[in-house]
C-alpha cells in the first residue's frame, strides 16, 4: 500500500534527521527529490563504505529517493530549485544551518504565499525561537545536553548511545507532523 503515491517532496537535507523523515515518506509512496551540493552531496555519503562501496547510513536513510545536484549559492540554481518547488512539490523539508532556508526564500512564510497549501517542514536542533535558535546541533550534542550520556558508558567515560537516537527521534517527529 502506498498512501502517499502522487505526493512529491523536495528536500534539502543531510545527515540523519531529515533524511530519516523523508525516507519514511518515500516508503509510503511519495516521490522524494533530494537536492544535494555539487561535488560532495550529503556528507553522510562519506560515513563508511559498507554497502557495495556506499555509506550504510546514507543507504539506510536515502533509499527510494531521487537526487538532484544544485549549488543553491548561485542565482540560476536558486531559480531552478524554486521552479521545482512551485511546479512539483507538495512538501518541502529542510535541515540546513539555521537561517539558510529563509535566505534562500524557502521559509513557510514565503512559500505559502507563492503556493498555498504547501507543507514546509523545518528540522533543527533547537527550534525557530529561543536563545539557541541560531546554533547548529548534532546528535551527540543533543544526547549530552539531554543528560543521556550520563547513563551510558561509565562515570569516568560517558559515551553516546550506539545509534543516532536524537536524530532518529527528530526525524520520526518530523515525519508524523508532516502527516498530521
What residue ranges belong to the model's regions?
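N-terminal helix-loop segment corresponding to the beta1-alpha1 unit
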Residues: 1-180
Amino acid at each position: 500500500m502506498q498512501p502517499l503515491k502522487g505526493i512529491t517532496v523536495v528536500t534539502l537535507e543531510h545527515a540523519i534527521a531529515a533524511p530519516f523523515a523523508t525516507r519514511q515518506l518515500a516508503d509510503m509512496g511519495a516521490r522524494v527529490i533530494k537536492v544535494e551540493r555539487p561535488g560532495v552531496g550529503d556528507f553522510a555519503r562519506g560515513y563508511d563504505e559498507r554497502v557495495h562501496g556506499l555509506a550504510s547510513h546514507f543507504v539506510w536513510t536515502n533509499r527510494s529517493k531521487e537526487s538532484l545536484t544544485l549549488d543553491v549559492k548561485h542565482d540560476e540554481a536558486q531559480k531552478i530549485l524554486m521552479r521545482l518547488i512551485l511546479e512539483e512539490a507538495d512538501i518541502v523539508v529542510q535541515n540546513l544551518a539555521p537561517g539558510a532556508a529563509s535566505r534562500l526564500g524557502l521559509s513557510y512564510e514565503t512559500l505559502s504565499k507563492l503556493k498555498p497549501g504547501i507543507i514546509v517542514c523545518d528540522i533543527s536542533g533547537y527550534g525557530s525561537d529561543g536563545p539557541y535558535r541560531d546554533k547548529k546541533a548534532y546528535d551527540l550534542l543533543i544526547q549530552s545536553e539531554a543528560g543521556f550520556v550520563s547513563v551510558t558508558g561509565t562515570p569516568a567515560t560517558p559515551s553516546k548511545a550506539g545509534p543516532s537516537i536524537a536524530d532518529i527521534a527528530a526525524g520520526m517527529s518530523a515525519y508524523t507532523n508532516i502527516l498530521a
